[in-house]
Amino acid sequence: EEEVVISINSLGQLYFEHLQILHKQRAAKENEEEASVDTSQENQEDLGLWEEKFGKFVDIKANGPSSIGLDFSLHGFEHLYGIPQHAESHQLKNTGDEDAYRLYNLDVYGYQIYDKMGIYGSVPYLLAHKLGRTIGIFWLNASETLVEINTEPAVEYTLSQMGPVAAKQKVRSRTHVHWMSESGIIDVFLLTGPTPSDVFKQYSHLTGTQAMPPLFSLGYHQCRWNYEDEQDVKAVDAGFDEHDIPYDAMWLDIEHTEGKRYFTWDKKRFPNPERMQELLRSKKRKLVVISDPHIKIDPDYSVYVKAKDQGFFVKNQEGEDFEGVCWPGLSSYLDFTNPKVREWYSSLFAFPVYQGSTDILFLWNDMNEPSVFRRPEQTMQKNAIHHGNWEHRELHNIYGFYHQMATAEGLIQRSGGKERPFVLTRSFFAGSQKYGAVWTGDNTAEWSYLKISIPMLLTLSITGISFCGADIGGFIGNPETELLVRWYQAGAYQPFFRGHATMNAKRREPWLFGKEHTRLIREAIRERYGLLPYWYSLFYHAHVASQPVMRPLWVEFPDELKTFDMEDEYMLGSALLVHPVTEPKATTVDVFLPGSNEVWYDYKTFAHWEGGCTVKIPVALDTIPVFQRGGSVVPIKTTVGKSTGWMTESSYGLRVALSTKGSSVGELYLDDGHSFQYLHQKQFLHRKFSFCSSVLINSSADQRGHYPSKCVVEQILVLGLRKEPSFVTTHSSDGKDQPVAFTYCAKTSSLSLEKLSLNIATDWEVRII
């Protein structure tokens, strides 16, 4: 069926200004034609088109006004999403005068919420969804960009008053999207879907898929600006063990360096970083340290000297190294748009060069918008000059992208190409998913910031960046205890899971809030670790099939209109629905369970509801509203260790939630958790679990993969089994049958199988009779 879904330039807003040469630089000519051009340009200067003032700063535009723009009309679409990063609702809003969505990467400390201002990252990619169709627009431009949105709702009007019944016609709604960029070319991709999954795949063909993360990075991360010294690190690490709380990575902020000189260590505070890392290694944990793009101007700092000697810094208009103030004081900024600079920067992570680093050290890229104190909007001036003589205005939003790229490549190179990197970045662009994780920046310890984190992460997720998270507890300020507990509970069900706080905040380790609250935080973190097999499998699908890990409901239920504007609950993969508690002193939450033919099971109580309705769920402070979708199988770990490294050989459990038809399906992806062997040598296991006609089958989902594993499935829980079985047996691939002891609960219609020993890597069946 032919259907017009998108029109280009229907409002006639196509605009393109070519680069010009400043008239004063032209050779003087006496003819009147040249004189008239000069006069025209002088008039443009008077209008600020060639020279613009921002406070005390003057932005001289070497090539004159160079903006571009184009409008798109989306037919029948009223629900739009994407164009992160904004602390705004998931569904994009109509914009008014001076209220456009701004894409301009900025260091905004304690950013305002429900605001269209630009913050740390930009992805110029918009999705539109309606019943039966999803489309996308990818506006590939790294300069400052504004996006205006205006929806014309559907209207019904009378064609004629003739006859007994007036003829009526309904005009479909239309949404107009106007893209405007300060400079660059018009390079736009239209993604026609028609399904959300199709659009995700089409976009990933252009920008890449989410990098497969090392397993440790899906665990809990403990960070603070700053842990004081090696003894502090040792004490915090021991505190997690003492309180039986798992965690995987300790983080060090800028104070670990010698005067904010990156790739160095403070000799008084961290005199023996290798020994500190060996302590963490003995606990099967990692260390993450910060590395920012500004380099302290210091003739005794080798990184600065080598970069300056090779001309690797961004330049000012006079051709000298651009200088700005950041954490170390006066600094120069590496020009990551230059491939040679990226190659050199990557080499700095080699173990002989980065002294004190080991193979358990990973990286955090911050301040890479780039942040420049005391400059316009606290960033680099637009007329700074990059590689190829391009002005900063042309590529501002991609600066942090290149920084993370060079860092990730450095971590890969130091291992000889064998090990996966982990790099967290604050600034990002389309395609940043290929190099690591992103977080929402300097949030505040308030309930409203917990609440806004959900739509912010959903927007990142559908624009390709699945590995995303928000600082637990809020970076700025001191959260009340209830808020901190609720934030841990929410964060445990979000992709990147890190506690972080500014240097002015009180210490915030999980055991500092009383015994009961420590228990609640411990339970939330342990729930995360128990679900790591499911998380890891979801990231594999994000990596190979472009499917978001954290999904808005409309992605999973694209034909259910009520889901289109929901942002307080979401799906993890296709199996789990999560509704974090984001209000203080809440005693109930209203949870919408979608799908008229679905059945949903409370993850803890096993109570079940039919889909297509809103249910009021009572919540105490220990309640995390999570529901498993009927028809799914979720793999878990039956025991939780001190970190992911302690759990590689521990047993699995399967949570089988039956659909209304009595069937279920699920998957497990497994590899060594750290190397590229899954890619180069096909060293992985991909298993499929299917339940039908009272038989659970474990089979291979991908015959190409081979990975030796002694792990067994120890427990199986079947939800929605309406009749108690007479007996249960296992049937192995060698033809042997074994009876299985079981427990059936009629109240919850659940069947529990314990003390099994079914190898995860081999085919087998469990028969319920």
From Swiss-Prot:
Gene Ontology biological-process annotations: carbohydrate metabolic process; N-glycan processing
Keywords tagged on the record: Glycosidase, Hydrolase
KW Acetylation (keyword) present: no
Role description: Has alpha-glucosidase activity.
UniProt similarity note: Belongs to the glycosyl hydrolase 31 family.
EC number: 3.2.1.20
Coiled-coil zones: none
Disulfide cross-links: none
Record has Hydrolase as a keyword: yes
InterPro entries xrefs: Gal_mutarotase_sf_dom, Glyco_hydro_31_AS, Glyco_hydro_31_C, Glyco_hydro_31_N_dom, Glyco_hydro_31_TIM, Glyco_hydro_b, Glycoside_hydrolase_SF
Protein name: Neutral alpha-glucosidase C
Top-level taxon: Eukaryota
Catalytic residues as annotated in Swiss-Prot or TrEMBL: 366, 369, 442
Molecular function GO terms recorded: alpha-1,4-glucosidase activity; carbohydrate binding
Gene symbol of the encoding locus: GANC
